UniProtKB/Swiss-Prot annotation:
GO terms for molecular function: ATP binding; four-way junction DNA binding; four-way junction helicase activity. Its main location: cytoplasm. GO terms for biological process: DNA recombination; DNA repair. This is Holliday junction branch migration complex subunit RuvA. Residues 1-63 are annotated as: Domain I. The keyword DNA repair applies. SUPFAM superfamilies: Nucleic acid-binding proteins (SSF50249), RuvA domain 2-like (SSF47781).
Length: 196
């Protein structure tokens, strides 16, 4: 899988950008919000998702881990493909999307072309309670985003995982550790709290 591309934007289109990462040029499909943040001839680091099918190969790009995670959750919902997921990310900002999911706002979600009430219901079932607030994404918890995702992948609720990580990060034992030891301690203690 292509996880990330470092390169220079040499072309911007309506729903994609072209990045040169010598010796290759990649066309990367992006949300309208992502596209608006990027500038022509700017050096960028884009997180990616590679979509492979028999008849096509598409590369989707994201500015941050959370946007990619939401995209991956969306495409795991029956009836939503990568292009529909990207339309959803283009249709509303992260906080708007999160709030619509938490409120089960069918009207807001179904404003996206191709998303009806039935598919909106599936999205709510899949994503409700899994998305964190945008201000939490920029907190010190974000430093341990990979650890958080690993624990969520073990079947734990994201909100409970984030809450446990925040609590553990405040205790003296954690604060006295060197940075390289903090992640192991955090992983072990978070699992203890969530399992106990």
């Amino acid at each position: 899988m292509i996880n990330k591309i470092y390169g220079k934007i040499i072309e911007k289109r309506e729903s994609s950008i072209v990045i040169v990462a010598l010796p290759f040029e990649f066309e990367v499909l992006v949300s309208s919000f992502c596209n608006a943040e990027l500038r022509l001839l700017e050096d960028v680091e884009i997180l990616t998702y590679l979509h492979l099918r028999e008849d096509e190969i598409k590369l989707f790009g994201f500015l941050n881990v959370s946007e990619r995670e939401v995209f991956e959750e969306l495409i795991s919902v029956d009836g939503i493909g990568p292009r529909a997921a990207l339309r959803m990310l283009s249709g509303m900002k992260y906080d708007e999307f999160r709030d619509a999911i938490e409120r089960e706002d069918v009207k807001r979600i179904s404003t996206v072309k191709g998303i009806g009430n039935k598919v909106a219901g599936k999205i709510f079932l899949k994503l409700r309670g899994k998305l964190v607030k945008a201000d939490e994404l920029t907190s010190s918890v974000f430093k341990f985003k990979d650890l958080e995702q690993s624990i969520v992948n073990m079947g734990f609720d994201r909100k409970l995982v984030v809450a446990a990580i925040k609590e553990i990060m405040l205790i003296d034992e954690f604060l006295m550790l060197r940075e390289v030891e903090q992640e192991q301690f955090l992983f072990r203690e978070t699992l203890k709290r969530l399992s106990g």
